[in-house]
């Protein structure tokens, strides 16, 4: 993935790459910058790494992508589909409302400087989830030692 492709990877909640994958933020070779994708890439790899890769336009391999936080997992090419299927299986076991709320929780934590307000919002969120039909099903399934019955 190069340029905008790296931006797409950075937007993914879960990113799996094959060992053969190559990456590069090569816009500076053209006298340009990865400005449009920069918020997503910086959020994924951090400002220090972004400064290096934006400025040098150096290509990097999948292991480097994992080390800097662009991808979560690197697998042999012949295991890529199975690794993605495993992630989908794990996501399918999560409650849909809880999974969506987890994404919002991360956004809120990053965006909120007021920790007291964040603690209050988080307490309200978990209270809403506990009494929701999904929360009740999840807790009931846990107590009954069974798989939750929800649609994902």
What would you call each of these model-derived segments?
Residues 3, 35, 59, 136:
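Glycine-rich phosphate-binding loop at the start of an alpha helix
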Residues 39-48:
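Hydrophobic, secondary-structure "cap" segments at the distal end of domains
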Residues 16-21, 71-120, 127, 133, ...:
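C-terminal long alpha-helix characteristic of the crotonase
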Residues 140-152:
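Terminal low-complexity tails and localization/encapsulation signals of metabolic enzymes
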Residues 1-30:
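Glycine-rich beta-to-alpha active-site loop
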Residues 58-64:
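Acidic, divalent-metal-coordinating active-site segment for phosphoryl/phosphodiester hydrolysis
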Residues 49-58:
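Short helix- or helix-capping micro-motifs
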């Amino acid at each position: 993935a190069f340029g905008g492709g790296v931006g797409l990877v950075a937007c993914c909640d879960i990113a799996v790459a094959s060992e053969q994958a190559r990456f590069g933020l090569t816009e500076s070779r053209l006298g340009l910058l990865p400005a449009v994708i920069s918020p997503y890439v910086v959020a994924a790899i951090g400002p220090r790494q972004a400064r290096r890769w934006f400025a040098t336009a150096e290509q990097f391999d999948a292991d480097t992508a994992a080390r800097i936080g662009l991808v979560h997992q690197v697998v042999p090419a012949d295991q890529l589909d199975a690794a993605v299927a495993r992630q989908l299986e794990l996501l399918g076991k999560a409650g849909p409302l809880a999974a969506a709320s987890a994404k919002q929780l991360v956004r809120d934590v990053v965006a909120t400087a007021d920790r007291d307000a964040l603690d209050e919002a988080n307490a309200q969120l978990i209270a809403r989830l506990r009494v929701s039909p999904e929360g009740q099903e999840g807790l009931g399934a846990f107590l009954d030692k069974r798989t939750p019955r929800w649609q994902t």
